[in-house]
Amino acid sequence: MAKVRVHELAKELGITSKDAVTKLQELGEFVRSASSTIEAPVVRKLRNAFPDAANKAAAPAAPKAPAPAAESRPAAPAPGPAAPKAPAPKVEAPAPAAPAASAPAAPQASSAAPAAPSTGAKPGARPGPKAETPAPAPRQGGSSQGSSAPRPGGPRPGNNPFATSQGMPRGRGGDGDRAPRPGNNPFATSQGMPRPGRSDGERPGGPRPAAGAGGPRPGGPRPAPGAGGPRPAAGAGGPRPGAPRPGGPRPTPGMMPNRTERPAPAGAGRPGGGGRGPGRPGAPGTGGPGGGGGAPAGGGFGKGGRGRGGTQGAFGKGGAGRGKQRKSKRAKRQELEQMSAPSLGGVSVPRGDGNTVIRLRRGSSITDFADKIEANPAALVTVLFHLGEMATATQSLDEDTFALLGEELGYKLQVVSPEDEERELLSTFDIDVEAELEAEGDEELEPRAPVVTVMGHVDHGKTRLLDAIRNSDVVAGEHGGITQHIGAYQISHEHEGVERDITFIDTPGHEAFTAMRARGAKVTDIAILVVAADDGVMPQTVEALNHAQAANVPIVVAVNKIDKEGANPDKVKGQLTEYGLVPEEYGGDTMFVEVSARQNLNINELIDAVLLTADAALDLRANPDKAARGIAIEANLDKGRGAVATVLVQSGTLAVGDTIVAGTAHGRVRAMFDEDGQALDVALPSRPVQVLGLSNVPRAGDTFLVTSDERTARQIAEKREAADRNAQLAKRRKRISLEDFDQAVADGKIDTLNLILKGDVSGAVEALEDALLKIDVGEGVQLRVIHRGVGAITQNDVNLATVDSAVIIGFNVKPAERVADLADREGVDMRFYSVIYAAIDDIEAALKGMLKPEYEEFQLGTAEVREVFRSSKFGNIAGSIVRSGIIRRNTKARISRDGKIIGDNLTIETLKRFKDDATEVRTDFECGIGLGSYNDITEGDIIETFEMREKPRV
């Protein structure tokens, strides 16, 4: 199926394009305007959203009941005796008469009908069945003179070619004189001269016979008066036989193909139909009150329901009865709002009442805000400019800027939190994780292993404790003995005679990895807080404790390094009591276990304490019989296997071949491995596994879920990526106020250090970025991370650094082949680090080096004026004695008298020792000092010399 545009589909469904675009956006589709193209699945979604409109569009047009019967009728009725009068009861017949009720009217045609030539549809007419118009019944109440006189041909007076009554009126048997011609108004309901012979202005004539049915006549030309069928003379008692007009029939609007109108009930018609005479009541089956016999429902030659003057008019304008098109209520309301809206900065914008709540996503732009309040984005840019902020209409803004704009305009702006944004995103795909958990019954839940996080200060022995638990050696693989990323393992332990599984997550303790440690607290069931017995509570210990308490996670304290000299476990217990962790022996509920990871002491007791806490305080159950849900613990880019993510399954079962989406990455699970590298087919709840097959590297802490198809996973990942990109742009936006803008332009462009970060795992790269962005060395230098990624440094990274003059920072990675040579040729600076301390120190030093130097005044010496010598060549010369320091030539000087500065920013232009020029004069020596053109020198003045020196940065 070819792609269709939104407005085409909206027209097909019978809805407005705006409603279609709004519904598609509510369904989670990215549609910019009504001209956007959408694919077949999206078309089906929109059709399902409007089932009534879709059924109406799919159904054919309502068939016109009389059409098949009319097609089989002869062109003219059979000759018969003329009916002098139409049956009177039919005038009073109700409008919604059945089609069969009008059938007897057909034999009442004029006897002169056979003499009329058969007039069929012209070649240009729209094909369709058409019942020929029979001869009209004789009119009542008129004179009988001239009953069989044919209507003469020739040109007809009047210049309205579309009028239903043309030319001069014919005499009506002398019933009255001709009335004056009313004029030539193409929009009048009665065109041309009125017909004489009606003293009261009305025709009491009976109804015209219908064309065999009361419903609307199918398309086709109607015979023009006097051109086709017979037309009775005015006032005649019988029908007047018509004759063909010389030279062919005159074209009338009735000969034009009728436009398809909405079908009307048979015999109903519409009020105001254009009939042959003004105010003549229509018979059942005709066009309704005033309708012409056999015309479409509503009568007349024009569109149905337009009345006598309902044609397009002489100049192609709208027909009579419509008049000037009125504005809709919405247009009037908008105009009134624009007129009454207060003006700010020369523009008018709609304002709220102070309580109007507007919800925006993170990283929204002024255009998004303008769409919410139906305002012009350019006007909001002007308002923001007058508020002292500079931004473009499509630039992502932070929450503070939106709060400033909303407060000025009377709106309460609410920025959607990441959790709500994620929930709304998944709801567009009919995914509700919280509802799934609430709907699960007890019979569906099965016990699962507890997830334990090891937290604590750096170098307090967390990883070595896990080594003792796993009987492995992980510390040797960490740079500097510091854990750089999260590791997840699962062990089996016999507890009370039962084999129990426990999942451990090791989180780094370095202060730069706060975000990673916080993620570890979000996914865990129990936290083991490791505290060294010799060091006690440290800053990162308190931070880890706060993370665990904020996540409402039970805590088991492991007092490590009890085998070292100076260990004092009681001191640790006393310190932790201040933070709400009271040991059981002190009457609290927190379990403390004294262990030694190096000596392998009390390791089993620690595991038993964890299991006891889990059984006593937690209900660890999950439903394995559903699609998997979980969290990405860590991710990296492997050279041979591609993107590898370590995920923790929290509920459901993850199997090979499932389609998953993790953050901004999506794909199909190609393979799964455990912590020992063994391949797995399925992963049950609380099981950490390595997953292969993702499109890119997800971030540590991103949630993952299994979707029904790959298309859904791709759309979720793309929308997450767009939201994250906008949020990052808003967060990194440099706010420049109008007060600082002129100064920034005068001083030059603000210096920016561009960085490209590459690392071995995504969590380490993100932690490094957060640590670098916290460096603050002043307002004149800005740090900007233009790209970050996982894996080796590639040529694309070097090319990007060349364009943006960036520095590449490699964290536990090296450049790929021939990349180092390319970087040397392009002059790109690449730095490689394995410990985060060195990276932070070097970047901070580089930022300080980019700052403009700051100078401070340094005093050199002072001299007292003893005598003033006047010289015509050099001006006044101060004969002085140096009281302190050194007096140098060409240095800055100032003169003070009685403690007040009388001359500043002077220069010592001449300095002499007796008659010889001197470069400098030291303390207690006499000299002559010349200050150039400055001559206000007297005895007793103090000359102070100084120089500006660059201030060293701390």
From Swiss-Prot:
One of its GO terms (cellular component) is cytosol. Residues 56-75, 88-125, 138-151 have a biased composition (Low complexity). It is found in: Cytoplasm. The keyword Membrane does not apply. Residues 596-598 are annotated as: G5. InterPro entries: EF-G-like_DII (IPR053905), IF2_II (IPR044145), IF2_N (IPR006847), P-loop_NTPase (IPR027417), Small_GTP-bd (IPR005225), T_Tr_GTP-bd_dom (IPR000795), TF_IF2_bacterial-like (IPR000178), TIF_IF2 (IPR015760). Residues 481-485 are annotated as: G2. Residues 76-87, 241-254 have a biased composition (Pro residues). Keywords: Cytoplasm, GTP-binding, Initiation factor, Nucleotide-binding, Protein biosynthesis. One of its GO terms (molecular function) is GTPase activity. It holds the Pfam family IF2_N. Residues 456-463 are annotated as: G1. Residues 323-332 have a biased composition (Basic residues). SUPFAM superfamilies: Initiation factor IF2/eIF5b, domain 3, P-loop containing nucleoside triphosphate hydrolases, Translation proteins. It comes from the Bacteria. Residues 560-563 are annotated as: G4. Residues 506-509 are annotated as: G3. Residues 56-355 are annotated as: Disordered. Residues 269-322 have a biased composition (Gly residues). GTP binds at residues 456-463, 506-510, 560-563. Residues 447-618 form the tr-type G domain. One of the essential components for the initiation of protein synthesis. Protects formylmethionyl-tRNA from spontaneous hydrolysis and promotes its binding to the 30S ribosomal subunits. Also involved in the hydrolysis of GTP during the formation of the 70S ribosomal complex. Belongs to the TRAFAC class translation factor GTPase superfamily. Classic translation factor GTPase family. IF-2 subfamily. HAMAP family: IF_2_B. This is Translation initiation factor IF-2. The gene is infB.
